[in-house]
């Protein structure tokens, strides 16, 4: 039991001696209870620690109850869907038609680059438009059909041979420019995804990340992606064993393994290192004649 250190401890006076002398009066001494004070100090320290812990816990709960600020959400970015706002601003100024264009297939080892241009109907802008990379295959297919049914659409393919000859950037810009000029009505303004403007017969505005900002570009990205995916499935029938229907020509391990086992096809791009190495092994060997599916323009006019 811990004593109360606030009250001093009194030592009783010594009794009178038996010799008959007068008993001396001894003043009671006050003894400082060192051991008791130490024990009490530990208790006080423990109490203070418990109190601090309780305060910290309360603060943590209060912080958790507050809504997280944008500054605290590191790495979390709220992505707003593409809008038709910039197109409407141009329409108010009397500028029409307005096209968006984008491409698909710059990075794969095989297959073409596919460019698409789209002029959306302001009264029938499909809901759910977004960058094709952020959509599921099922959602892309559904939007593809809706876009083709309500908008002006053109699709152009740049073959692997053109990519090998001109490089991937020039082939992509060539396809994008042709897609714009292949539209039923030549647009007065074009939004293109990326840094590079096109040499078109109308005003062209390059927008970095445009497929996630502008509805017309988002629609074009969906048309280009679905068109290319469908074509790669056709190539898979002509070139079995490569898995084009699965990876769409990208350099995944399964594709690299097939390339090492079977060698490259005419649909592979020579300037990629794995393809170049495979070509060196079979240089001079006869190549199978495969029907060319590229360099064709496909135009789908808007329905009434």
Curated annotation (Swiss-Prot):
Q: Does the keyword Transcription regulation apply?
A: no
Ranges of Basic residues composition bias in the record = 24-35
Q: Which InterPro entries match?
A: RNase_HII, RNase_HII/HIII, RNase_HII/HIII_dom, RNaseH-like_sf, RNaseH_sf
Principal subcellular localization = cytoplasm
Annotated stretches, region: Disordered: 1-53
Give start and end of each RNase H type-2 domain.
Answer: 96-284
Q: What is the catalytic activity of this protein?
A: Endonucleolytic cleavage to 5'-phosphomonoester
Sorted UniProt keywords:
Cytoplasm, Endonuclease, Hydrolase, Manganese, Metal-binding, Nuclease
Entry GO MF terms: manganese ion binding; RNA binding; RNA-DNA hybrid ribonuclease activity
Q: Where is the composition biased (Low complexity)?
A: 36-53
Q: Where does a divalent metal cation bind?
A: 102-103, 193
How are cofactors bound according to the entry's free-text note? Manganese or magnesium. Binds 1 divalent metal ion per monomer in the absence of substrate. May bind a second metal ion after substrate binding.
GO cellular component terms attached to this protein's record: cytoplasm; ribonuclease H2 complex
- Family, per entry: Belongs to the RNase HII family.
Cross-referenced HAMAP family, in alphabetical order?
A: RNase_HII_B
- So what does this one do? Endonuclease that specifically degrades the RNA of RNA-DNA hybrids.
Protein name as annotated: Ribonuclease HII
Instruction: Give the organism the record lists.
Output: Rhodopseudomonas palustris (strain ATCC BAA-98 / CGA009)
């Amino acid at each position: 039991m811990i004593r109360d250190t606030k009250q001093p401890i009194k030592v009783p006076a010594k009794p009178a001696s038996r010799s008959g002398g007068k008993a001396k009066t001894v003043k009671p001494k006050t003894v400082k209870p060192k051991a008791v004070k130490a024990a009490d100090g530990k208790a006080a320290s423990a109490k203070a620690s418990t109190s601090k812990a309780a305060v910290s816990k309360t603060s943590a709960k209060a912080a958790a109850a507050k809504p997280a600020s944008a500054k605290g959400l590191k790495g979390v970015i709220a992505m707003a869907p593409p809008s038709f706002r910039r197109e409407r601003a141009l329409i108010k100024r009397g500028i029409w038609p307005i096209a968006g264009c984008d491409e698909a297939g710059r990075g794969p080892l095989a297959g073409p680059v596919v460019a698409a241009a789209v002029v959306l109907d302001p009264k029938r802008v499909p809901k759910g438009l977004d960058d094709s990379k952020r959509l599921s295959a099922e959602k892309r297919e559904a939007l593809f059909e809706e876009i083709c049914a309500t908008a002006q659409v053109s699709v152009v393919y740049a073959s692997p041979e053109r990519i090998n000859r001109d490089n991937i950037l020039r082939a992509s810009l060539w396809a994008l420019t042709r897609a714009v000029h292949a539209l039923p009505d030549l647009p007065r303004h074009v939004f293109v995804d990326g840094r590079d403007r096109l040499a078109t017969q109308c005003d062209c505005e390059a927008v970095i990340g445009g497929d996630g900002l502008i509805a017309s570009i988002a629609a074009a990205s969906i048309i280009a992606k679905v068109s290319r995916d469908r074509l790669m499935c056709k190539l898979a029938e002509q070139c079995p064993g490569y898995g084009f229907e699965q990876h769409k020509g990208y350099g995944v391990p399964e594709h690299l393994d097939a390339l090492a086992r079977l060698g490259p096809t005419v649909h592979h791009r020579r300037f990629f290192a794995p393809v170049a190495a495979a070509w060196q092994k079979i240089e001079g060997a006869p190549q199978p004649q495969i029907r060319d599916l590229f360099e064709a323009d496909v135009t789908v006019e808007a329905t009434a």
